[in-house]
Amino acid sequence: MTNPTTGPTRHRRRSTRAVTIACAGVAVVAVAVSVAAVSLAGSRSESKAGAASPVAATATTGAPATATTAAASPSASAGKPSSAAPSSAPSASKAPAAGSGAPAPKGGWIFVDQAAYQKQVDAYKARKTDPVPSGVGNLPEFRADCKYSHRRADDPIVFPGLPGASHMHSFVGNKAVDADTTAGDLMKFTASTCKPVVDHSAYWVPTLYEAGSNKPVETTGFRVYYRSLRQKSDDIKPMPNGLRMIAGDAKKKVPTPRGAQGQFYCAFYGPGDLDGIARSENGNWPICGEPATFHFMLQFPDCWDGKHLDSPNHKDHIAYGNENGCPSSHPVRIPAITFDIQYGAKGTKAGYYLSSDPQGKSASSFHGDAFVMWDPDAMNKRVKNCVLQRKTCDNDGYYR
């Protein structure tokens, strides 16, 4: 495993490598990606207070819905949501009562600062929508385009305060992220590899390695969408700062042969075989035809319990909704984050492996983490103009 100390410290900037981001108008056919919220134990409550964060408070202790997209969007659909009623809480873990004063267990619940979040929601409701020019797209989304930042064996969500405790992760966004990062740090140390600069969030995924050489393969494009997954957006609310989310299952270890869900696919500027023109020797990885390269899409939940920024297993505070709405246990509908990730890899006979499953050498353990931190007014503006009005916006939050 790579030495975790080779990444940047939280108080030092590092240079980032160049990146090519797929632009609007790129035709990418829809790809079905099956994800489930990951259950990972062993995290601790934050060791630092998030006083600098406008929302974050102190710790007190499936099948995804999908985006509706079109060929004009550089993103791909993650599948069709179920029409059945949303389920209740995704697991049986019970949240404590706010202000109970009970000692915080490891991997505990982190309460949202209700006063700060209500202030943000009030400002969101009072905000007027901007006029919409003609010719604007109708995909209800805004986005951030991010470059690779650094690689560390850290995870401030699952293993906060424990440097080197995680498998290797590749980080984009906030440059200061390490095992000790808190919500307050994200607002204090705001240097980022993402555009817009008002997105101070941190995003990370397990590092991809070439099986033949054991060399890491880093992302060449990392677009983060915030979008509506449903036909209507009238009940959407802005995301609270400090929200932690995980999508995918780091413990899943099954083959990913041609046609399997939850695998890497081949994409480029035009039609082509998503499964590649050939497969690796173990069949788990595509070999892309020219000029296609590896891509992966990961869909996060769009329903929140309205109380907690994190939970013991990092999934009980969020849930997937559908066209019938959010489950009663998670009544607050928020924009759904989608990772649209591009790699320079084209595939080899030896194949690849993820840091989350180096022995299995399949893609099934792919997962992603999001530690949300935006300028509150910038978040409100984008949710109101782009998602609520169901209009497509660029990195700067303008209609396009």
Regions found by a protein language model. Give the residues of each.
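Compositionally biased, intrinsically disordered low-complexity segments
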Residues: 29-32, 58, 145
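A ubiquitous, low-specificity "background" feature that marks scattered single residues
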Residues: 13-14, 38, 52, 173, ...
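Primary mode marks residue(s) on the alpha4-beta5-alpha5 output face of response regulator receiver
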Residues: 94-166, 170-298, 305-400
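N-terminal low-complexity, Pro/Thr-rich disordered segments
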Residues: 34-134, 393, 400
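Sec-dependent N-terminal signal peptides
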Residues: 17-29
